[in-house]
């Protein structure tokens, strides 16, 4: 789900199954990074995507009661579009997003990639997610956390949980 530079009111994404999000990119254009060199990059390569929900400059986004899984990159990713302004308007900040009571399942890079800590996450369940799956990208360097650190350092997901079980969604039969 892509929502772009919405600045007015609240936008709600609720009660969805978002599954097997591979993204649109040419895998041949992704450079091979030996060893841990990719761990120290300050930003993502521009050809990789695969976000379950992608907020581009959208403020006041509410993401509630969704099952988001098997995403190539992240279940939720947002970035500001600071210079997308016309006339007397401002750019999009991607702040005041609230991710509430969602299940994030085995997203390859991260369950959540928030642009800043000016957002909220509460009551989410993270299933089959591995190290550094909760991220705040700015100010740089990004922080890559697990649930206990997310709770301790940012006060996010105090009612959140981690779990390890299998989910199988039949995308043909929608079951």
Language-model features: where?
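Glycine- and acidic/polar-rich repeat regions and solenoidal domains
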Residues: 1-174
